[in-house]
Amino acid sequence: MSLLKTSERGFSRELPDVQSTLPDVRINLTRVGVKNVKKLVEVTRPGKRPVIFISNFDIFVDLPGSLKGANLSRNFEVIDEVLQSAIEGEVKEIEQLCSRVARRLLDKHEYADRTEVQMRSEFMVAGETPVTGTLCQEVVKVFASAIAQRTFKDPIVRKSIGAEVTGMTACPCAQNIMQERAREVMENLDIAKDKIESFFKEVPMATHNQRGRGFLSIETDDESHVKLEKIIMILKQSMSTPIFELLKRGDEGHVVLSAHKNPRFVEDCVREMARRVHAEFGDLPGDSVVTIAQDNEESIHQHDAFAERQATIAELADEINGENLDVS
């Protein structure tokens, strides 16, 4: 058993290092660590004011069966050290911060072969309404993580960055039902078919709506970079319409009209995200992993609708380019 020196009331004594003793059951543990560590994160940006995140961290290491416990205090030492380097401008992105922490954990926990860092926070996005240009803000949930694996050479690190955005969708199925009903009524009123079609182009029919939550994360190697702002933009553009905290009457009419001119199923949202990811991030390494999900809160049903896709950048490219399209 190793001993630790401590100072108490002016004298030194040696205490046993209980964590380094043998456990009663000698099996390896996949993850040992701390969860919900709240920290203020300041990330510098060239030519702009820093971005401030109030974040929750989960920090883990694996533990061999020969040790009773992990030295959890080292996790706090590492994260404070890396957060200070972020304030000093050495860290530019939150996923880079997670990567730094994961690497340093391997240095601090010499017995660990794998470390993992997860970060959850909120990001304020400034914008303006579509008609009146009223300035507004939106809170977006953001996520970052990193996993470091010890090797005989340098550690292998995989990092990810993602966001969750709320928007609005309009149901295409119910809209089609309402349109056929309106067409029947107008035909019975002897309105010409060309005028009916012209009307539908300008005034889309009513349908039920959903408040949708889109999620997108991209996992890459440690050398690649994914801009958080682009992820947020993809999410906003993949639903029927973005939503806003404050809407004047002209803005409100524009948002409702835009949504009903762009009806989308939950499946459509996920596929549109995938298309935009391919267009925006197609130059990332082919083994980069994309996770896309859409969760819609139904207005006329008691359930929610959900769709998801996980694929590599290479797999998305093959499907979007038609190379692996299943037409059976």
From Swiss-Prot:
Site (described: May be catalytically important)? C171
Query: Can you state which reaction this protein catalyses?
Result: GTP + H2O = 7,8-dihydroneopterin 2',3'-cyclic phosphate + formate + diphosphate + H(+)
**Which InterPro entries does the record match to this protein?**
GTP_cyclohydrolase_FolE2/MptA, GTP_cyclohydrolase_MptA
Q: Which cofactor does it need?
A: Fe(2+)
Q: What is the enzyme's class at the highest EC level?
A: hydrolase
Q: Tell me the cofactor note.
A: Binds 1 Fe(2+) ion per subunit.
Q: What are the BP-aspect GO terms?
A: tetrahydromethanopterin biosynthetic process
Source species, domain of life = Archaea
Keywords of the record, alphabetical order, are: Hydrolase, Iron, Metal-binding
Q: What metabolic or biological pathway is this protein involved in? A: Cofactor biosynthesis; 5,6,7,8-tetrahydromethanopterin biosynthesis
Annotated EC: 3.5.4.39
**Molecular functions (GO terms):** GTP cyclohydrolase I activity; GTP cyclohydrolase IV activity; iron ion binding
Subunit and interaction comment: Homodimer.
NCBIfam families (alphabetical) = GTP cyclohydrolase MptA
Family, per entry: Belongs to the GTP cyclohydrolase IV family.
Function text: Converts GTP to 7,8-dihydro-D-neopterin 2',3'-cyclic phosphate, the first intermediate in the biosynthesis of coenzyme methanopterin.
The protein depicted here goes by the name GTP cyclohydrolase MptA
Which organism encodes this protein?
Methanospirillum hungatei JF-1 (strain ATCC 27890 / DSM 864 / NBRC 100397 / JF-1)
Q: What is the lineage of its organism?
A: Archaea, Methanobacteriati, Methanobacteriota, Stenosarchaea group, Methanomicrobia
